UniProtKB/Swiss-Prot annotation:
Protein name, entry field: Uncharacterized oxidoreductase Rv3410c
Family: Belongs to the IMPDH/GMPR family.
The organism of origin for this protein: Mycobacterium tuberculosis (strain ATCC 25618 / H37Rv)
Annotated function: Has no inosine-5'-monophosphate dehydrogenase activity.
GN (gene name): guaB3
Gene3D superfamilies recorded: Aldolase class I
Note: Was identified as a high-confidence drug target.
GO cellular component: a single term: plasma membrane
Superkingdom per UniProt: Bacteria
UniProt cross-references to InterPro entries, sorted A to Z: Aldolase_TIM, IMP_DH, IMP_DH-rel2, IMP_DH_GMPRt
NAD in keyword set: yes
Length: 375
């Protein structure tokens, strides 16, 4: 702890950019490295989950990411469930963003588009398209809308439910309605639930005790895109937050005699090196936003914005153009080949090489790799 003033202390925390991986074992061939992981009954060949935003995930994007071994999470409260002509609406949004450099112009239009009511039939049809392709189907809902939307999604045939907000606690209390008790809610479902975001050990442990199969660390923070720090004064030191959640996972494992809850890191991960650092800090998988927005399959055509940007009264994000011109296919973003010397392409290939250089063959072992702090 450090003193920030008389009688007020704060904890020193670390970002992913402040730590480094320390290879200290015999190196291995990257061909011998496995990046597979399993969430409940569902196995994935790569530890990559798409951030649930309309900028990325359409049914077609989710299908392609699933085919490549990852998980695409559809935003259950996004434009896909509100507009039949969602591609036209997004084209209108991108045109507004490109025409006016003032961020509020595009945000106002995004808010207007989100003011349309959710259509369960549209949402169900999107889920059905993903499910029919034979890949794992996951949809994100907010804690506020989980109780009424979940039955619709379960009936449509989802495999995984993601309950995600900027911050999620084990119980959501509201004076204008019934509180959402996640433990009771999850126990009544027949499908696994992933919940988040959390920023510390205590909240992560509380969420694990609700019966969640996975816990999300962070809220998808991205410099220049998410503005939760500016709006709420809340930011996430991802290296520390991931390590804290991993410690909560160990504590819960001991507490329950063997129940393992997966930790998913969501925020400030843009390169293969940052992906590797997130796993090294204790994450089982990462939730990616801007790196995947560069792909040709992304619905936002090179633009990115978080779901929180559409909040009707307090938007916490902006639209940012990530890629211009011809964009690489998702397969190349994840698996290469790459001509980017800064780690923006071949993300999983970079992770494999990092694991091999450090002498580890699987993700859980790699969580034990040595780390140093710079500065």
């Amino acid at each position: 702890m450090v003193e920030i003033g008389m009688g007020r202390t704060a904890r020193r925390t670390y970002e992913l950019s402040e730590i480094s991986i320390v290879p200290s074992r015999r190196t291995r061939s990257s061909k011998d490295v496995s990046t597979a992981w399993q969430l409940d009954a569902y196995r994935f060949e790569i530890p990559v989950v798409a951030h649930p935003t309309d900028a990325l995930v359409s049914p077609e994007f989710a299908i392609e990411l699933g085919r490549l071994g990852g998980l695409g999470v559809l935003n259950g409260e996004g434009l896909i469930g509100r507009h039949l002509d969602v591609e036209a609406k997004i084209a209108q949004l991108l045109e507004a963003a490109a025409a006016d450099p003032e961020p509020s112009t595009a945000i106002r239009l995004l808010q207007e588009l989100h003011a349309a009511p959710l259509n369960p039939d549209l949402l169900g049809a999107a889920v059905a398209r993903i499910r029919e392709a034979g890949v794992t189907t996951a949809v994100r809902v907010s804690p506020q809308n989980a109780q009424w939307l979940t039955p619709v999604l379960v009936a449509a045939g989802i495999d995984l439910l993601v309950i995600q907000g900027t911050i999620v606690s084990a119980e959501r209390v509201a004076s204008d309605g019934e509180p959402l008790n996640l433990k009771t809610f999850i126990s009544e479902l027949d499908i696994p639930v992933v919940a988040g975001g959390v920023l510390d050990h205590r909240t992560a442990l509380h969420l694990m005790r609700t019966g969640a199969a996975g816990v999300i660390v962070g809220y998808g923070s991205t410099q220049g895109v998410t503005t939760t720090d500016e709006v709420l004064g809340i930011s996430v030191p991802m290296a520390t937050a991931i390590a804290d959640a991993a410690a909560a996972r160990r504590d819960y494992l001991d507490e329950t005699g063997g129940r393992y809850v997966h930790v998913l890191a969501d925020g400030d991960i843009h390169t293969s090196g940052e992906l590797a650092k997130a796993i090294a800090c204790g994450a089982d998988a990462v939730v990616l936003g801007t790196p995947l927005a560069e792909s040709a399959e992304a619905l936002g055509e090179g633009w990115f914005w978080p779901a929180a940007a559409a909040h009707p009264s307090l938007p916490r994000g902006a639209l940012l153009q990530i890629a211009v011109g011809e964009r690489p296919p998702l397969a190349r973003v994840l698996g290469g080949p790459s001509d980017d010397p800064f780690g923006g392409l071949n993300l999983v290939g970079g992770l494999r090489r990092s694991m091999a250089k450090a002498g580890y063959c699987d993700l859980k072992e790699f969580q034990k790799v040595g780390l140093t702090v710079g500065g």
